[in-house]
Amino acid sequence: MRKTFCLLFIFSVFFAENLRAKINIGILKGMDSIPFAFLYSDAQENQKKLENPEVSELSYVSEEVKDSSEDQSVQPEEKYSFSFFETPLELFSKMKAGYIDASIISSESAEKLVKKSNGQVCVCASVTSIDFKIVTRRKGNISFSDLIGNKVYVAGEGLAHSVFRALLAKNSVPVEEGSAGVEIVVKKSQAELVTEFLSKNADYVLVSEPALSDIFNRSKNARVAIDIQEQYETVFGYGKKLPRSVLVVRRDLAEGSPKEFKNFLADVEFSVQRASRKPRGAAGIAAKNDFGVNKRISAQAIAGTKFNFYTMPLD
């Protein structure tokens, strides 16, 4: 009896470490989850084929979305399940509780989640780099020193705000009200920045996609004054890129199921590459599956996104 129990215990431990149920992916609605688009589409399509093997094509998948030339031998539907979330708070709660294994979120949100999870959640890859740009109607070449005496509108006090202040400091431009420095006006969201710019209340706004595309679609006079990523590399060194969005996973997935984790990283990277090459296809998938993006501007916004997938140390 004891021998049988020991064998069963060893058997169960072996399979617990080597066989994992579906990886549960959380999709936080918005631009940051666009890199999951093709992974999600493949999973849904293959699930339909499993349920009805005689169906060779899915009627709901448009020609724009189909990509038979990039068909993979893997079957994502056997490995992944997906849940959608409206807010980071909802996603964080499920990840900490162990119901969600992985997600793509902003680097700012990731920092908060890692701290709140007490190490249960970790960052494992960069997905996109910052695409912040200062937009204006004013013509001519504009440098940081040209911003002195002006107001620059930003959303929140997160990554964009911090990087902007750092670049101003590196260029010896003071942050203060009046004619001697740059005044930073903080708004709650980038949607507010778009409104302020279009209503001509703001001469300079610091925005990223999809707000950037929204402005250019609605204002003929808008132009990029300063590309923050380019300036960041000028100051801190060529090739230095700050992640805008990152892939976060539960540590028990990364360390407890290394084979599945490695395959998952490869599948996500492939999905990111496809979104980069086929922004219209990614936009179509996102619009059909309620990723929380506006189809009117999402294809343009995806095309302007700086996809930059690379893995990172877990600690």
Show the residue positions of the predicted features.
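Sec-dependent N-terminal signal peptides
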Residues: 4-13
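A short linear boundary/processing microfeature
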Residues: 42, 170, 174, 218-221, ...
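Boundary at the C-terminal end of the N-terminal hydrophobic targeting segment
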Residues: 16-21
